[in-house]
UniProtKB/Swiss-Prot annotation:
NCBIfam families: prfA (TIGR00019), PRK00591.1 (NF001859). This is Peptide chain release factor 1. It comes from the Bacteria. One of its GO terms (molecular function) is translation release factor activity, codon specific. Residues 284-306 are annotated as: Disordered. GO terms for cellular component: cytoplasm. It is found in: Cytoplasm.
Length: 361
C-alpha cells in the first residue's frame, strides 16, 4: 500500500478513537442531533478500524512465526504459519484499500431508467427495446421492481423512448455506469441482402432525488400542461385530462406522467422525476469537469459518450471505457446477465478512485 493511503488510514482510525471519546461525553449524549451525527460517522469508520486492528494482529503473528523459524524443530510449522499470515495480510491490504474509497451517497437510491432510440431509424428503436428488456431481466434477477413511467413505441417494434422507475436495494450502485451511447452491429430483419447495419440508443441512469438532498423549485419557473392519457387505465384515461406535462423554464427540462388515474398522482410523479433530473444535471456537470481533469473514464456518466458496442454476428460485446473489456457472451448478456460487465466496471472505478486518493496530498 502506498504511504499516502497508509497515512489516510491512520488519520481515520484516530478520528474513530476521537468519536468514541466524544460519544461517552454526557454533553454529547444529551445533544440528540450531534449524538446521531457522531454515531453515524463512527459506524462508517468502524470497518476500517476493525480491519486495521486485524492487520496489526496478523503482523504480530507473522513476526512470531518468523522468530520460530530459527528453531529447526519448529521450522516446518513456522513456515506454514508464515504463508497463512502473508496471504491474510494481502487480503487485508486489499480490503483496507477498498474501504478507503468514499461511498457514493446515492448508491442505495432508486433510479429512473431512460432509454431512447438514436441513429438508425426502426432498427434503433428495436435496439432500444432490446436494451430495456435487458435491464428489466437484470432487475428481475436482483428482485427489483420496474415501473414504466412513459413510453413511445417504435413503428416496427421496440421504443423510440421508454422511461421507467427501478426500485430496489443498491439499484443505482449496480446500474450507474450504464449511462451513455450503446451501439449495435447486426443484420436487421428487414435487410434482404444480409448487410450489417450500425444503430445506436442512449441510456440515462438518474438516481431518484433523496428527500434529504431535495432541491427547491420556484413554482413560477414551471409550466404545467394537462392532456388526455394514452397509457393504461381503461376508458377513464380517455375521458379526463389526467396526464401531466411539466416544463422547467430555466433549463428546458420536460417531464411527463400519465400512468396514474388522477391528475394529482401524475403531478407528484412528474415532480419527482423533475427534481431527479435537475439534481443529476448539476452532478453530471461537476462529474464531467472532474473527468476532464482526472481523465476519469468509467464514472463520468456522460450520456453522449459511446460506452459499448454489441456485435451480434460475432456474439461480442465490448465496453470502450475499460481496456480489453470484451466478452463473447452476448446472448446471455442481452438476456440480463450483466454482472460480468458491471463487476469489471466497478473494479475499474475503484482503481481510478484509489489512484486519485494515492495522488492526493
Amino acid at each position: 500500500m502506498k504511504p499516502t493511503l497508509r497515512r489516510k488510514l491512520e488519520a481515520l482510525v484516530e478520528r474513530h478513537e476521537e468519536l468514541e471519546r466524544l460519544l461517552s461525553d454526557p454533553k454529547i449524549v444529551s445533544d440528540t442531533d450531534r449524538f446521531r451525527t457522531y454515531s453515524r460517522e463512527l459506524a462508517q469508520l468502524a470497518p476500517i478500524a476493525t480491519t486495521l486492528a486485524e492487520e496489526t494482529r496478523t503482523k504480530a503473528d507473522l513476526a512470531a512465526a518468523e522468530t520460530l523459524r530459527t528453531d529447526p524443530e519448529m521450522r516446518e510449522l513456522a513456515e506454514q504459519e508464515i504463508a497463512i499470515a502473508q496471504a491474510h495480510l494481502t487480503t487485508l491490504d486489499e480490503e483496507l484499500q477498498r474501504l478507503l474509497i468514499p461511498q457514493d451517497p446515492r448508491d442505495e437510491c432508486n433510479l429512473f431508467l431512460e432509454v431512447r432510440a438514436g441513429t438508425g431509424g426502426d432498427e434503433a428503436a428495436i435496439f432500444a427495446g432490446n436494451l430495456f428488456r435487458m435491464y428489466t431481466r437484470y432487475a428481475e434477477r436482483q428482485r427489483w421492481k420496474v415501473e414504466v413511467e412513459s413510453d413511445t413505441p417504435g413503428e416496427h417494434g421496440g421504443y423510440k423512448e421508454i422511461i421507467a422507475r427501478i426500485v430496489g436495494r443498491g439499484a443505482y450502485s449496480r446500474l450507474k455506469f450504464e449511462s451513455g451511447t450503446h451501439r449495435v452491429q447486426r443484420v436487421p430483419a428487414t435487410e434482404s441482402q444480409g448487410r450489417i447495419h450500425t444503430s445506436a440508443a442512449t441510456v440515462a441512469i438518474i438516481p431518484e432525488a433523496d428527500e434529504i438532498a431535495d432541491i427547491s423549485i420556484n413554482p413560477a419557473d414551471l409550466k404545467i400542461d394537462t392532456f388526455r392519457s394514452s397509457g393504461a387505465g381503461g376508458q377513464h384515461v380517455n375521458k379526463t385530462e389526467s396526464a401531466i406535462r411539466i416544463t422547467h423554464l430555466p433549463t428546458g427540462v420536460v417531464v411527463e406522467s400519465q400512468t396514474e388515474r388522477s391528475q394529482h398522482a401524475n403531478r407528484d410523479k412528474a415532480m419527482k422525476r423533475l427534481k431527479a433530473q435537475l439534481i443529476e444535471s448539476e452532478r453530471s456537470q461537476q462529474a464531467t469537469a472532474e473527468a476532464m481533469t482526472r481523465k476519469l473514464q468509467v464514472g463520468s456518466g456522460d450520456r453522449s459518450q459511446r460506452i459499448r458496442t454489441y456485435n451480434f454476428p460475432q456474439g461480442r460485446i465490448t465496453d470502450h471505457r475499460v481496456e480489453n473489456l470484451t466478452l463473447y457472451d452476448l446472448p446471455n448478456i442481452i438476456e440480463g446477465d450483466l454482472d460480468p460487465l458491471i463487476d469489471r466496471l466497478r473494479q475499474e472505478h475503484q482503481a481510478e478512485e484509489l489512484a486519485r486518493l494515492s495522488n492526493a496530498p
